[in-house]
Structures are given as structure tokens and as C-alpha cells.
């Protein structure tokens, strides 16, 4: 019986990669299951210790700073204890959990590490409290508040309102940072970035203003206007000779100043005449010349030739 080479080639091309992929997936699955079992064993070992620590903290929080007989703890009454005395009063060893009880909830690795770090910090705080004196026991117990189970599972943020779990140093730092940010915002609001200074009246404008105020009625008999009173404090109001007018009893005639002013490329005094000067005109934008050329282009060719 002859073997078909095409069938063998197709079988090898399909079956061989699939077999290798399945084998690799099985290897990874076995490693993952082994890792889960190891984590479950660690959880079983630490669960008893966590339960004991939480129970002990709740008992201490409920009993307060005094003992069951209304007396302070032994280590606090004796003063600062030695290292041997503190070692004897450490938390009891965790009781092993029953082997038949399986973990119902999965806890990720970062949460376990966080719980371990919190338990270590709390144990250090307990040792410091145990070795402290009886006078400072109450203040340290108030500052180093015990962490509850809710705080271990859900992070609690600091707020302005005082709470039993708030750290005084963190609250003071937060108030200082808020005060510094508010002062920075106030200073930025008071500063004038990018604004132009107040325009002071020039000599010509001041003279025109004085002439207008004096031409309405007698300068000596009339009451000064609000504009004149407001400009009295300006340092440049009477700084020029042309702005000071003689005080006489007769009405002053209106003096017409020969001031050339442009408004929309037209002379103010003569609206019919188009001025050749343009304040926005340069060698690249010659509006007058371009307009003249455009008007000439609209005329008939014979008329342009005659001109």
C-alpha cells in the first residue's frame, strides 16, 4: 500500500503546530494552578494571624487606655520598659487555620503585601506605645489611631473635618499646602500680565480739553467739571505751557487746533477728500495706487488712451 506524501505533509503541517501549542498551554496552566495553590496556602497561614490581630485591636479600642480594673497597662505604669519586657508582651502566635476550609475569595498579591506592611507598621507602633511612659500613653494612643477592617480594604482619604483616623501632621501639611496655593493664586490675580499702562493725556489733548471746558461758560464763574477735577491729580496735566490758560472774566473764544487726524483713511475735517496717506500702507500694500489702477481698468480703452 503506497503512502500518499501529500496527506502526510498536510497532517504534519496541521497536527504538529497544534500539538505544540496545546502542550505549551498545558505547561502554563499547570504553573498557574501551582501558583494559585501556593497563594492559597499562604492565605490560610496568614488568615489566622490577621483575625487575631484585628480581634486584639478591637478589644483594645473598646477597652480604651485603661485596663479591665480601671488601671493603666502594666508596661505604661512601670515607665519605659526594656526590650526583654516588650518582647514578652508581643502578639500571640497565630493559630493555624483548619486545613479543610478553602479560600472563598481571591485576594491579589498587592493587597496581601499592603496588609502585611500595615500589620508591620501597626506592630511597631504597638511596641513604641508599650515602651512609652504612662504620661505620654494617652497622646500617642490618640495620634496613632488603630486601623479598622474597613480602612484595610477601602482606602480612606484625608479631609478637612477632624476624624478619628486623621493624622494631625497630614492635616497640618494639607492646610499649609492649601494656604500656599491660595496665596499664589492671589498674587497672580494682583499682578498685571500683558496689559497696557494707562494712557496719559498729551499736551495737545490737554489743551483741547481745557479750551472746551472754558468755552462753555465763563471760566471764573462756572463750576469745574468732573473731568477737570479728575485730571487734577495727574502729574502731566499742568506740565506744559500750552495747557495753562489765563483766568479772565470774559468768555474765551474756542481755539481751533490744526491737528491732522485720520479716521478710516479719511480726513476728519473733509470727508469728501480721500487722503493719499495711509497709516497701514507700505511698499507691499499700496492701497491708493491699487485702487487707482482698478478704477482706470474699468474705463474704456479710448478714454484711457486720451488721458
From Swiss-Prot:
Location (main, coarse): membrane
Compositional bias segments (type: Polar residues): 128-137
Region (Disordered): 61-137
Keywords: Cell membrane, Cell wall biogenesis/degradation, Membrane, Signal-anchor, Transmembrane, Transmembrane helix
Transmembrane feature ranges: 8-28
Cytoplasmic compartment residues: 29-307
UniProt-annotated location(s): Cell membrane; Bud membrane
GO BP, sorted A to Z: cell wall organization
GO cellular component: cellular bud membrane
Lipid bilayer topology: Single-pass type III membrane protein
Residue numbers on the Extracellular membrane side: 1-7
Function: Plays a role in cell wall integrity. Affects the cell wall polymer composition in the growing region of the cell.
Family from the record: Belongs to the SKG1 family.
Protein name: Suppressor of lethality of KEX2 GAS1 double null mutant protein 1
Classification lineage: Eukaryota, Fungi, Dikarya, Ascomycota, Saccharomycotina
